[in-house]
Curated annotation (Swiss-Prot):
Protein name per Swiss-Prot or TrEMBL: Protein translocase subunit SecA
One Pfam family cited in the UniProt record for this chain: SEC-C
Keyword Membrane: yes
Residues annotated for Zn(2+) binding in this entry: C920, C922, C931, H932
Functional summary from the UniProt entry: Part of the Sec protein translocase complex. Interacts with the SecYEG preprotein conducting channel. Has a central role in coupling the hydrolysis of ATP to the transfer of proteins into and across the cell membrane, serving as an ATP-driven molecular motor driving the stepwise translocation of polypeptide chains across the membrane.
Enzyme Commission identifier(s): 7.4.2.8
Cofactor note: May bind 1 zinc ion per subunit.
Chain sites annotated for binding ATP: Q86, G104, E105, G106, K107, T108, D535
């Protein structure tokens, strides 16, 4: 109905195309004049366009000429001319919209148009892909176009960065693949300074986080986030929207508990009921030890299960698993249950070389470097008998949703976006425009066939493969898991059918296998959408046959002469053209889906592998009542009852439009459910995103060398004002109530800020006859004098360096603690719904309070350390920078995380190091974090010397024990502290019993300015 009214009123998808058509006609009219230009004149057009921009013209003014120039450059360099529909796609991308272009319509070529146009501003453009291979190949393929027009293009990956240089030949690259040979290695910064940069979503996001952990401007690599085109935009902005990018460092956590609970949960049995059934049937005491909620992938223990766990853990009678003393155990129990009963090997992950590797549920690809968060990955490792790695603490994090929304202009392209247009509009403010195909689509999409059992379904799939293979039609079989692909592979082997398997275990051969999936008689089994981004050409890809043809002739490709390679290329073209003609006559590529995905879009992507550029093709999905989607979300009972009433045999399918509509209805419900979750994620993450923006902007100002002297003195003035209010209280309107004053306590507290304030500069006797304001002014004047004295002693330039380093160090330290607190808050906030409160509003309120405390803690860190640190500034700066280098090392090793990313190993010392809030073992009486924190090597040397002296004194010969790890216990989330204050060293307390650092914030800065 909505589509009908859109069409009637002229607001449908065709409207945008009609508005663009006059621009396309203008571009076409310029083609003859542009064709007449020489290469030098074509290149000079770039300088002309830049000058016209400087003179006041807009990119829209330049668009027709710029697109005509790019089209001609493409024809001259790579032999491809943009079709009119590709020009339409380019215009849509320039407008900051999403272009839905079907498979094979040339998205890589389309992107050159808006990238060139927007790069004319000199502010940089990014092309975002889903993997390093596509980024490098796409940029290398289009590189000659940009080079002819005088623009630079670079590519980045986790391992390298390189810039396109036609005069450079990479000795390690395949010499026959021109897309890969001209990549000259360069620095990361140089790659971002290129006019156009290709890379993956992970690398762009991680570079942003690394830049915001840098301690020197020279470490920054990215420029402003100006314009980006996201390839496979639905995969990155929807499928991976809930996957945060996390840079983490190691926490100190033992794996023993994970192994213990992995064994314990195997004694538990699942309930036969779902939560919905328990609710509908009002079952008070369900069978089994736990109930699985499939939608949220969570598990809830029954009363019987709780009792069994308490027996297994030997919890004394009268005590409960949920008592505070046992609370930390629920963390391990929950993860062990999910690992054992929800996460399945060869579906959600694989075990390879003693490592648990996550499998992408949408693409079926392995994701090395990614780790589930909050202990889940360690629980899966324990389940599989793999040594659990240390848990990590978050150093920096951002979601793809918030990263890509920072670009001033964002566009995207994919073959399947229209079904998700509402989400793109509401979350990213992106409109989806469906681009017409160059040739009409003639693929046949048959109705689904549904069977009672999974066994009958797979037998039917094999029969269909056999029929297609017998006549020579290529077949691509899409599966949803590694397990299914290997099951089908075994069945085909037993029938003697030659085939290729493409799944998470073999993705290294992905592009090559997919490229040949269109050859006559080819059978390819692909996990979900593996190979996305690689075209399937009917008859096969000739480039992929060259090595095979040479091998048949007894020639290794690296030893072949140019003449032999050319002969092999001709032979490959002849073979693929002949096979392509035969395959078209047979009906083209046939797609078989073995299970419906939760999202219609993923199913459409699989179908879209056939029927490219007007080629023939067909598709059909085979389902069973035992499939996950139907069991979890579909009306399985109704369909099963219908089959029983009709007396349908297990081996006979139901094939009807009604079934298709029923399944699509289930998919629509799931899509809506997942959309709500992602929208919910954005609403919560937006809270932290605003705070992250404030912190990162503050950090950047410090990094760029802004003079922080006045700001530091204002912070000190605030703290002094707060101390004056604490120690010299006003009483019922009387400003100077000397009986309640503790001037000695005030002086002691102030000396923790400025150790130079001895009796000659500031004493209780000097202050006891002054008013409160006069005392505050006298203290600040004395501190400012000492501050100036320190500047003269070490030099103003060095003092500015100390200020910047101290402020960056304080921000980073407190930000890490804050992120941990926010994670805990996010986990516990759902309980607010039980109290009839809106969790989002409560989250916003708590987050605001935590952020205010974060800022106060940062200020305290700086105030109580800046003057003392200036005495050993060189040594302290070395130690602080060494700590930052450790964090940056973790950042360089970071990969995308479904939760926590890999981090560096924790360094174990031969002496025990205290927690940050524990007394420093050096004997100073100060807390560790304001004494030897950041100077661990010095402390270790001191303690080791003491151990040696003690051993010598008692003639003992016992070796030093390894340092115990930081405690693994976690208090209940309601008790987790929100950030960590940085109080001054321990001193005699004021009458209230509170330390000076706990004094409330005051108005000292404003008073000082007066």
């Amino acid at each position: 109905m909505k589509a009908f009214f859109e069409k009637l009123l002229g607001f449908g998808p065709d409207r945008a195309i009609k508005q663009i058509e006059p621009i396309v006609r203008r571009i076409n009219s310029l083609e003859p004049s542009v064709e007449a230009l020489s290469n030098a004149e074509l290149r000079a057009k770039t300088d002309e366009f830049k000058q016209r921009l400087a003179d006041g013209e807009t990119l829209d003014d330049l668009l027709p000429e710029a697109f005509a120039v790019v089209r001609e450059a493409a024809r001259r360099t790579i032999g491809q001319r943009h079709y009119d529909v590709q020009l339409i796609g380019g215009i849509v991308l320039h407008q900051g919209k999403i272009a839905e272009m079907k498979t094979g319509e040339g998205k890589t070529l389309v992107a050159t148009l808006p990238l060139y146009l927007n790069a004319l501003t000199g502010r940089g453009c990014h092309l975002v892909t889903v993997n390093d291979y596509l980024a490098k190949v796409g940029a290398g393929w289009m590189g000659p176009i940009y080079h002819l027009l005088g623009l630079s293009v670079a590519t980045i990956s986790h391992e390298y960065s390189a810039i396109y240089d036609p005069d450079y030949v990479d000795p390690k690259a395949n010499p026959d693949d021109r897309r890969l040979v001209h990549w000259r290695p360069c620095s990361r910064r140089e790659a971002y300074l290129a006019d156009i940069t290709y890379g993956t979503n992970n690398e762009f996001g991680f570079d942003y986080l690394r830049d915001n952990m840098a301690w020197d401007l020279a470490q920054l690599v990215q420029r402003e986030l100006h314009y980006a085109i996201v390839d496979e935009v639905d995969n990155i902005l929807i499928d991976e929207a809930r996957t945060p990018l996390i840079i983490s460092g190691p926490a100190q956590e033992s794996g023993d508990e994970y192994r213990r609970f992995a064994t314990l949960v195997r004694h538990l049995k699942p309930s036969p009921y779902t939560p919905d059934q328990i609710k509908k049937q009002m079952i008070e005491d369900p069978e089994g030890d736990f109930v699985i909620e499939p939608r949220s992938k969570s598990i809830q223990l029954t009363d019987q299960g709780v009792a069994k766990i308490e027996r297994l853990l030997k919890i004394p009678e009268g005590e409960s698993l949920y008592d505070p003393k046992y609370y930390r155990l629920t963390h391990y129990l929950d993860n062990a249950l999910r690992a054992e009963f929800i996460y399945q090997r060869d579906r959600d992950y694989i075990v390879e070389h003693g490592e648990v590797i996550i499998v992408d549920e949408f693409t079926g690809r392995k994701m090395p470097g990614r780790r589930w968060s909050d202990g889940l990955h360690q629980a899966v490792e324990a389940k599989e008998g793999v040594k659990p790695r240390q848990e990590n603490v978050t150093l920096a994090t951002i979601t793809f949703q918030n990263y890509f929304r920072m670009y001033q202009k964002l566009a995207g392209m994919t073959g399947t976006a229209y079904t998700e247009r509402e989400e793109f509009a509401k979350i990213y403010n992106l409109e989806v425009v469906v681009i017409p195909t160059h040739r009409p689509m003639i693929r046949k999409d048959y109705d689904d066939q549904i069977y009672r059992s999974e066994k009958a379904k797979f037998e039917a799939v094999i029969r269909e493969i056999e029929e297609m293979h017998a006549i020579g039609r290529p077949v691509l079989v899409g599966t949803t898991s590694v397990e299914t692909s290997e099951r089908l592979s075994e069945m085909l082997k037993r029938r003697g059918i030659k085939h290729e398997v493409l799944n998470a275990k073999y993705h290294e051969r992905e592009a090559r296998i997919v490229a040949q999936a269109g050859r006559k008689g080819a059978v390819t089994i692909a996990t979900n959408m593996a190979g996305r981004g690689t075209d399937i050409l009917l008859g096969g890809n000739p480039d992929g046959l060259i090595e095979e043809i040479l091998a048949q002739r007894g020639i290794k490709i690296e030893q072949a002469t140019p003449e032999q390679i050319r002969a092999a290329q001709e032979e490959a073209r002849r073979i693929t053209e002949a096979e392509g003609k035969e395959v078209r006559e047979l009906g083209g590529l046939h797609i078989i889906g073995t299970e419906r995905h939760e999202s219609r879009r993923i199913d459409n992507q699989l179908r879209g592998r056939a029927g490219r550029q007007g080629d023939p093709g067909s598709s059909r999905f085979y389902l069973s009542l035992e499939d996950d989607l139907l069991r979890r979300f579909g009306p399985m009972d109704r369909v099963k009852g219908l089959m029983e009433r009709l007396g349908v045999d297990d081996s006979l399918p139901i094939e009807a439009g009604l079934i298709n509509r029923t399944i699509e209805s289930a998919q629509t419900r799931v899509e809506g459910y997942n959309f709500d979750i992602r929208k919910h994620t954005v609403e919560f993450d937006d809270v932290m995103n605003k705070q992250r923006t404030v912190i990162y902007a503050d950090r950047r100002r410090i990094l760029e060398g802004e003079n922080m002297r006045e700001r530091v003195l204002d912070m000190i003035a605030d703290e002094v004002h707060a101390l004056v209010e604490r120690y010299l209280p006003e009483t019922k309107g009387r400003a100077d109530d000397f009986e309640e004053w503790d001037i000695e306590g005030l002086v002691r507290a102030v000396r923790t800020i400025d150790p130079l304030l001895d009796e000659t500069k500031l004493s209780p006797e000097q202050l006891e006859h002054l008013s409160r304001q006069e005392i505050e002014d006298a203290i600040m004047q004395a501190i400012e004098d000492d501050y100036q004295e320190r500047e003269k002693a070490i030099g103003e330039e060095n003092m500015r360096l100390v200020e910047r380093r101290m402020m960056l160090s304080a921000i980073d330290r407190q930000w890490i603690d804050y992120l941990t607190g926010m994670e805990d808050l996010r986990q516990e906030i759902g309980l607010q719904a039980v109290a009839q409160r809106d969790p989002l509003i409560e989250y916003q309120r708590n987050a605001y309070a935590m952020f205010e405390e974060l800022k106060a803690n940062i200020q305290r860190d700086i105030v109580y350390q800046i003057i003392p640190v200036s005495f050993q500034y060189e040594q302290h700066l070395r130690q602080v920078e060494a700590e930052q280098q450790r964090r940056l090392l973790a950042a360089q090793q970071a990969g995308a995380a479904d939760g926590n990313a890999k981090g560096a190993r924790t360094v174990r010392h031969s002496v025990r190091l205290p927690g940050r809030n524990e007394p420093c073992p050096c004997g100073s009486g100060k807390k560790f974090k304001v004494c030897h924190w950041g100077r661990e090597e010095e402390l270790i040397a001191l303690l080791q010397q003491r151990q040696t002296d003690q051993h010598a004194a008692v003639a003992a010969d016992t070796p030093a024990q390894p340092a115990p790890q930081a405690t693994a216990t976690r208090p209940p989330t309601s008790q987790v502290p929100r950030g960590r204050a940085a109080p001054p060293p321990a001193n005699p307390q004021p009458r209230s019993g509170k330390s000076p650092a706990q004094a409330p914030r005051g108005k000292g800065a404003s008073a000082r300015k007066k």
